[in-house]
């Protein structure tokens, strides 16, 4: 697909087949130019943001990525997961300061690495971190004015579909399909 063909998308949407072919373009400069023009045409040059309260549901993770400054090992005399009352207290504080979203961040499936994580999840009534996240994000929708935004790491298509029912947006490292 050449630059002229990409420029065609300024006037029409690509077909599904064409959209797949766009991933093979080597001339990323042209692709970025067309994407920028389409963005500006549709939304102008306004930069917007939404105030978020940061909810680190757990800092434990199955992975050990040496660039990561978020993840850590279990700490003595500390919960591995934020407790429901801690989460709700933080959410209320966010509402008080005008936040619109609750940004949930967490390590990827720590229960697969740490016995302690599995035991804490069981005490919370869950087998998985994603199950606990689902319950907690659901409470945000029901009990606060905030909108849950989930950054939950690697998920299956089923996980994504399930969590979509309790979130306004999701970020993923990658999806396993």
Can you say where each PLM-predicted feature lies in the sequence?
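Flexible, acidic/Gly-rich N-terminal and inter-domain linker regions that tether
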Residues: 1-62
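Short amphipathic alpha-helical segments, especially helix-boundary/capping motifs
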Residues: 8-14, 64-68, 112-114, 135, ...
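Structural signal for hydrophobic packing residues in well-ordered secondary-structure cores
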Residues: 10, 26, 39-43, 69, ...
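Short, well-ordered coil loops that connect the C-terminus of an alpha-helix to the N-terminus
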Residues: 44-45, 63, 146, 169
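Canonical Radical SAM [4Fe-4S] cluster-binding loop centered on the CxxxCxxC motif
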Residues: 47-86, 110
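Conserved Radical SAM active-site core
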Residues: 74-174
């Amino acid at each position: 697909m050449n630059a002229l063909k990409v420029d065609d998308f300024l006037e029409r949407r690509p077909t599904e087949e064409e959209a797949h072919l766009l991933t093979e373009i080597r001339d990323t400069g042209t692709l970025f130019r067309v994407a920028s023009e389409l963005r500006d045409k549709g939304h102008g040059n306004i930069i917007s943001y939404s105030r978020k309260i940061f909810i680190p549901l757990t800092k434990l993770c199955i992975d050990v990525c040496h660039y990561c400054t978020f993840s850590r090992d279990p700490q003595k005399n500390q919960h591995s997961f934020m407790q429901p009352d801690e989460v709700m207290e933080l959410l209320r504080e966010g509402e008080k300061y005008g936040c619109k979203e609750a940004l949930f961040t967490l390590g990827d499936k720590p229960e697969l690495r740490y016995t302690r994580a599995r035991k804490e999840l069981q005490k919370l009534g869950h087998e998985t971190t994603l199950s606990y996240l689902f319950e907690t994000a659901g409470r945000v929708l029901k009990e606060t004015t905030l909108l849950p935004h989930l950054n939950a790491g690697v998920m299956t298509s089923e996980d994504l579909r399930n969590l979509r029912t309790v979130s306004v947006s999701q970020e993923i490292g990658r999806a396993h399909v």
